[in-house]
Amino acid sequence: MHDPVEYFQNNLVPMVVEQTSRGERAYDIFSRLLKERIVFVNGPVHSGMSHLIVAQLLHLEAENPSKEISMYINSPGGEVTAGMSIYDTMQYIKPKVSTLVCGMAASMGSVIAVGGEKGMRLALPNAEFLVHQPSGGARGTASDILISARSIEATRERLYQLYVKHTGQDYETVQRALDRDTWMTPEVALEWGHVDEIVTTRGADDAE
């Protein structure tokens, strides 16, 4: 069965036509917005999606390593390794990456959102946030299951440290929040240090 998000992006993406000195040029809407240094993290986080996001970030860095990148996030989360590849690339590249949550930043979507540049992590008024510990299924021998459990515990510890670093919360607070599903409104996310500002309209500087 097809992923409805991928189907939409592949088959129902609007086209934008621009007039240039060489005539008309057509772009799909996401390519046109990429020209404006806007990247979308939309839908479940998986390896297919993450490598496209990483490629866009690297392209924009090569194009201009000193100019900000804007990332719009609406994601229910997904694969830890795929999400961490996006997060790590955001930290690795030279341009500052601002994040704006429009819809949902859950699970690995939350990790990507909190990894934006400090002071440039935004949320719209009706955004939702979810933080929790990683989950995984293990099968096989008792030894295999034990190895898998240790790996998940190590991943959980990395996530604890990541949230401590980016939110300013202490380790125990983060540990309690991630112990179970913790949903946050934008106001709670702001208080928690997950975002830096709740925005309702675009600023004058952003509109230019």
Curated annotation (Swiss-Prot):
<dbReference type="GO" id="GO:0004252">
    <property type="term" value="F:serine-type endopeptidase activity"/>
</dbReference>
<feature type="active site">
    <location>
        <position position="132"/>
    </location>
</feature>
<dbReference type="GO" id="GO:0009368">
    <property type="term" value="C:endopeptidase Clp complex"/>
</dbReference>
<protein>
    <recommendedName>
        <fullName>ATP-dependent Clp protease proteolytic subunit</fullName>
        <ecNumber>3.4.21.92</ecNumber>
    </recommendedName>
</protein>
<dbReference type="GO" id="GO:0004176">
    <property type="term" value="F:ATP-dependent peptidase activity"/>
</dbReference>
<dbReference type="Pfam" id="PF00574">
    <property type="entry name" value="CLP_protease"/>
</dbReference>
<keyword id="KW-0378">Hydrolase</keyword>
<comment type="function">
    <text>Cleaves peptides in various proteins in a process that requires ATP hydrolysis. Has a chymotrypsin-like activity. Plays a major role in the degradation of misfolded proteins.</text>
</comment>
<dbReference type="InterPro" id="IPR029045">
    <property type="entry name" value="ClpP/crotonase-like_dom_sf"/>
</dbReference>
<feature type="active site" description="Nucleophile">
    <location>
        <position position="107"/>
    </location>
</feature>
<dbReference type="InterPro" id="IPR023562">
    <property type="entry name" value="ClpP/TepA"/>
</dbReference>
<dbReference type="GO" id="GO:0005737">
    <property type="term" value="C:cytoplasm"/>
</dbReference>
<dbReference type="GO" id="GO:0006515">
    <property type="term" value="P:protein quality control for misfolded or incompletely synthesized proteins"/>
</dbReference>
<keyword id="KW-0720">Serine protease</keyword>
<dbReference type="InterPro" id="IPR001907">
    <property type="entry name" value="ClpP"/>
</dbReference>
<dbReference type="GO" id="GO:0051117">
    <property type="term" value="F:ATPase binding"/>
</dbReference>
<keyword id="KW-0963">Cytoplasm</keyword>
<comment type="subunit">
    <text>Fourteen ClpP subunits assemble into 2 heptameric rings which stack back to back to give a disk-like structure with a central cavity, resembling the structure of eukaryotic proteasomes.</text>
</comment>
<keyword id="KW-0645">Protease</keyword>
<comment type="similarity">
    <text>Belongs to the peptidase S14 family.</text>
</comment>
<dbReference type="InterPro" id="IPR033135">
    <property type="entry name" value="ClpP_His_AS"/>
</dbReference>
